[in-house]
Every structure is written in C-alpha cells, then in structure tokens.
C-alpha cells in the first residue's frame, strides 16, 4: 500500500494492456495529489481507423479506446480529462492530461470537442467503420504481396532489418513467409 501522493503520474503505451482499466484509474485517483496530473498516452481508436494502423493491433493489447471513452472512463472514476494532445508516437497517438474531477485545471473544451466530433464523424461506434477498415487492409495486403512478387520475379532478394512488433504483425497478417523474405535481422 502506498501512503504518499504524487503530483505527476505517467502511463505510456500501456493502458490498452490492462485487464481492469477502471480499477487502474481508481488506484491512480488514490495516489494522485489534489493538484496532480496523470498523463496517459496511447494509440487511440481514431488514429487506428483514420491512419489504418492495423499493425499496432496485437495479442498484448486487450482493447483500444476512443477519446470519448477515455473521457467517460475517467469521469466514472471521479477524474477529468482537462486537455489532450495528438502526436505521431506509434503512427498516431493521443496524450491525455487527467486530474481529479474538482481540480482547478481549466478544461480545453475546444480541443477535446474537436477530437470527439472527428470520432463521431468517422462513426467509431458503428461496425461498418471496421468492415471498411478491414477492406482497406486487405487492399494494402494485395498491393504489398504483388510488389514483393514482382521484386522476386525480377531476380532480386528481399531482406528485412528490424523485427518490431508492428513488423511481425504485418508479416503474420499478410502471411509473408520466408518464401518471400529470406532473412530478417534485428539489433537490440
């Protein structure tokens, strides 16, 4: 048990790994100072759909959240998203600035509302949005496999360097085997 409070707490690229995000936020609330800030950064659902970031979807990520849902989960746990910032981490992420619900931080309603409006415009709550995403990913797969086959047909050999999670997701989902790429190396 922690008997201290903290003015700054961060959770970077891990919120979607949590089996119980509500309990996590309750725990954050308990240790966050009255005037403290909790900084949460993650690939968001808007970026996944808009930028077709399928390669970030893997077994360790239990779920993905829209900003609308992050705001709601925070509110349900007596916290408040008072600002957010889009960034290019992992192809597209959002950093959320969260405080206690009654903290004196001014809420950047304009920025928050703009993100939520964009999420609503893209219909993140509708299944057809994800069916369209799937079709686009299949088209990417067809194009990439065609390019790889052309390169091989031209007598060239493809080698890979950098075996990141994203690279492995792409290789597995597109079924790119050693038939296409003979060697992949990585350096840690």
Please place each PLM-identified region on the residue numbering.
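Flexible, glycine-/basic-rich loop-and-beta segments that form/coincide
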Residues: 91-136, 140
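A conserved beta-strand element that flanks and buttresses the S-adenosyl-L-methionine
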Residues: 7-11
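Hydrophobic adenine-recognition pocket in adenosine-nucleotide-binding enzymes
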Residues: 14
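A short glycine-rich, Lys/Arg-flanked "PGG" loop and its adjoining helix->strand segment in the class I
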Residues: 22-39
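Short secondary-structure boundary/capping segments
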Residues: 23, 53-57, 175-178
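Conserved S-adenosyl-L-methionine
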Residues: 79-90
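A solvent-exposed beta-alpha-beta segment
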Residues: 2, 146-188
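Short, glycine-/aromatic-enriched active-site segment of Class I SAM-dependent methyltransferases
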Residues: 40-63, 67-69, 74
């Amino acid at each position: 048990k922690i008997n201290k409070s903290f003015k700054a707490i961060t959770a970077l690229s891990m919120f979607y790994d949590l089996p119980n995000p509500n309990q996590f936020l309750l725990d954050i609330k308990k240790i966050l100072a009255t005037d403290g800030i909790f900084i949460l950064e993650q690939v968001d659902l808007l970026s996944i759909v808009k930028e077709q970031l399928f390669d970030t979807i893997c077994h360790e990520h239990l779920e993905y959240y829209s900003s609308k849902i992050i705001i709601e989960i925070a509110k349900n746990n007596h916290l408040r998203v008072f600002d957010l910032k889009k960034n290019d981490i992992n192809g597209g992420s959002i950093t959320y600035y969260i405080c206690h619900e009654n903290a004196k931080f001014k809420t950047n309603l304009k920025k928050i509302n703009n993100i939520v409006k964009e999420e609503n415009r893209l219909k993140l709550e509708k299944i057809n949005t994800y069916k369209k995403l799937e079709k686009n990913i299949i088209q990417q797969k067809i194009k990439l496999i065609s390019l790889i086959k052309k390169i091989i047909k031209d007598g060239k050999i493809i080698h890979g360097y950098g075996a990141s999670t994203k690279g492995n997701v792409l290789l597995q989902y597109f079924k790119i085997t050693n038939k296409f790429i003979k060697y992949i190396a990585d350096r840690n």
